[in-house]
């Protein structure tokens, strides 16, 4: 089954997605990664995306849908996709539904990691990403993991959109824009809400129970 993994920026979606990928042989589709990859290509579209993200704003639905559809149509992902942080609004819900129907796929679980803004701010301020392996680490939540990172500390970089003010703005914007989506999915039997402030291993255990049902 495919999975939708929800939560505000800094909720730990990436960490949990990595766990599912490693242990359940899933493929993670993160709109953030798709956007950053487009930026790295230095295309005109990538330059426009970079300007928007640096302000803490969200990229348009039409652009996101183009990038996401290109990823979904890869047949090796069929019924093994984690949609990390997507969809964010009702239009994206409809776009996702159309894309899944077109490529004969569906959603089996919707998981929402619910976290407060003060915890989000601390998590985001301590977050770094490895430029070599793309792993996300946090110097506040798990400093030992940074010291022992196999790629070395020299590859750990802070993202441009991880400032304190931008972090809070992104949290508030996310919760405002995503609420209709959460309301839409929360009425279904496949919706699961998890306290995102719990220890990482506890959250992993709760997600594993969902996947085993």
Predicted regions and their residues:
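Glycine-rich phosphate-binding loop of ATP-dependent small-molecule kinases
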Residues: 1-213
């Amino acid at each position: 089954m495919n999975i939708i993994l929800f939560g505000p920026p800094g909720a730990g979606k990436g960490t949990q997605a990595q766990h599912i990928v490693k242990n359940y042989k899933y493929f993670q589709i993160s709109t953030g990664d798709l956007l950053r990859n487009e930026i790295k290509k230095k295309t005109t579209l990538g330059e426009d995306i970079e300007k928007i993200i640096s302000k803490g704003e969200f990229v348009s639905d039409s652009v996101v849908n183009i990038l996401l559809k290109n990823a979904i149509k890869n047949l090796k992902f069929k019924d093994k996709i984690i949609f990390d942080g997507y969809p964010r609004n009702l239009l994206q819900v409809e776009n996702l539904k159309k894309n899944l129907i077109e490529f004969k796929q569906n959603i089996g679980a919707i998981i929402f990691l619910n976290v407060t803004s003060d915890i989000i701010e601390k998590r985001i301020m301590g977050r770094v990403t490895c430029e070599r392996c793309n792993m996300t680490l946090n110097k506040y939540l798990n400093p030992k993991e940074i010291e022992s990172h196999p790629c070395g500390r020299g590859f750990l970089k802070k993202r441009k959109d991880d400032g304190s003010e931008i972090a809070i703005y992104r949290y508030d914007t996310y919760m405002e824009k995503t609420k209709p989506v959460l309301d839409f999915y929360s009425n279904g039997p496949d919706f699961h809400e998890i306290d995102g402030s719990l220890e990482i291993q506890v959250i992993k255990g709760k997600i594993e129970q969902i996947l085993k049902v």
